[in-house]
Amino acid sequence: MSNFSVFLIALLFCSVFILSEAQIYTSKECNGSSECYSHCEGITGKRSGKCINKKCYCYR
């Protein structure tokens, strides 16, 4: 049981680290996620962006 819990904690830690690397913060202000699509396409080459707290976040 202890080996499984160590494995689970390691998996969780690695997942959080990988996900944080995939997110790119930009200083562009927005009111909705649709405003971030063209901006993120210029940065990452993909139209994957989200408006969080009136700032655009792009994803790789």
Curated annotation (Swiss-Prot):
Tissue expression summary: Expressed by the venom gland.
PROSITE patterns: SCORP_SHORT_TOXIN (PS01138)
Flavoprotein among keywords: no
Molecular function (Gene Ontology), one example: ion channel inhibitor activity
Keyword annotations of the record: Disulfide bond, Ion channel impairing toxin, Neurotoxin, Potassium channel impairing toxin, Secreted, Signal, Toxin, Voltage-gated potassium channel impairing toxin
Signal peptide limits: 1-22
Disulfide bond annotation, renumbered to this chain: 30-51, 36-56, 40-58
Site label Aromatic residue of the functional dyad, positions: 59
UniProt cross-references to InterPro entries, sorted A to Z: Scorpion_toxin-like_sf, Scorpion_toxinS_K_inh
A GO CC annotation given for this chain: extracellular region
Record site feature (Basic residue of the functional dyad), residues: 50
Principal localisation: secreted
Subcellular location: Secreted
Function comment: Recombinant toxin selectively inhibits Kv1.3/KCNA3 potassium channels with an IC(50) of 91 pM.
UniProt similarity note: Belongs to the short scorpion toxin superfamily. Potassium channel inhibitor family.
Protein name per its UniProtKB record: Potassium channel toxin ImKTx88
Organism encoding this protein: Isometrus maculatus (Lesser brown scorpion)
